[in-house]
Amino acid sequence: MDLRRDALQILKETSRTFYIPISIMPSGLQEAVASAYLCMRAIDEIEDHATLENHTKGILLQSISQTLQAGVDGFAVDAFSIGFKGYEDSLPEVSLRIREWAILAPESIAPRIWDATAAMADRMAYWSQINWKITNEYDLDRYTFGVAGAVGLLLSDLWSWYDGTTTNRMEAIAFGRGLQAVNILRNNSEDLTRGVNFSRRVGITRTFNSMLVVI
């Protein structure tokens, strides 16, 4: 099986928005960015799962995080599937195949992707277990950094690793937060059906508006 080709196909099915730029990236960088996107999409699908209970989401996400933290020079074939036991029929393919996405990136940068994904999975577990209770700007900043701003930092590291490109990491965080603000506003109705309201306070709505300025 050609893992790179398979990953691009899953990426195309998952998000054409991200597939298009990643598909034309040079070799090496393409595998690294595809690995990062698919690993994070894998955990995002669990966080946003429509039927899993929040407690279950937390357990699954923490299992992924712990497995990634234990990685040395790769992962055993069943490293992640052990944690998924009993939920194989509930989770999407992109989540079930996270091991493959984790080993897609070149060895010289893969551990950085594991680290970022593990940290994000832990943060998602925390927020899911408290039902995304965000009551002030401080909470919103923590959430948007944890699930989006940190992606900007990872991408900055990938550019630097590939060819030494230097980026403004504060702006990378702000851009990630802005994109997450768009996602929150766009998915507001869906979130409300599961009892999650990110914008219940006027102050938070103002913060959303300030985040949108960067994009």
Model regions: which residues?
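Acidic catalytic motifs of isoprenoid enzymes
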Residues: 1-215
